[in-house]
Amino acid sequence: MCIRDSSVVKLDKKKADSKVKRWNMISESAAKQSKRSIIPEIMPVCTFNEALEMSQQLDVKLLPYECADGMAKTKKIIENLKGNESIGIFIGPEGGYDLDELSKAKEEGWEEITLGKRILRTETAGMMLMSVLMYMNEK
């Protein structure tokens, strides 16, 4: 979760830490229940620039964006995944990305993808994309 000046939700450090801890417990529990060998990790609350810095070591960086090119590009990117890469997913804020953020993310190797015609809630977009990635890369 990235804190931005335009963020609607304002979290203090204590609340943010407790939310991340809770989300990671949910992620671990869900992974065990579904017999996943890899547990998705929820990173600490940070600024947008800190998130870009943390993402430098990732193999694949996916940035769902409502104005991204059509499904063909997204499908190709997902189909070309080998299944053993480290993948980062950058879910946008309630109000969307601003152009400066998009530009910085692209400079750092993030690929804009689309999740379709509908604009999903922040809470569901990540789960939707994780589900698609798991389905497409099931071995």
Predicted regions and their residues:
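RNA substrate-binding interface of SAM-dependent RNA methyltransferases
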Residues: 4-62
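Short, charged, surface-exposed secondary-structure boundary motifs
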Residues: 11, 72-75, 122-126
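Generic beta-sheet signal
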Residues: 45, 64-66, 115
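Short amphipathic alpha-helix with an adjacent loop that forms part of the alpha/beta core around
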Residues: 51-56, 74-82
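Reductase modules of NAD(P)H-dependent flavoproteins
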Residues: 60-64, 68-75
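Short, acidic/turn-prone active-site loops that include or flank metal/cofactor-
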Residues: 67-69, 94-95, 117-120
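A C-terminal functional module that forms or caps the active site or interfaces directly
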Residues: 84-104
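Structured adenosyl-cofactor binding patch, chiefly the S-adenosyl-L-methionine
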Residues: 99-139
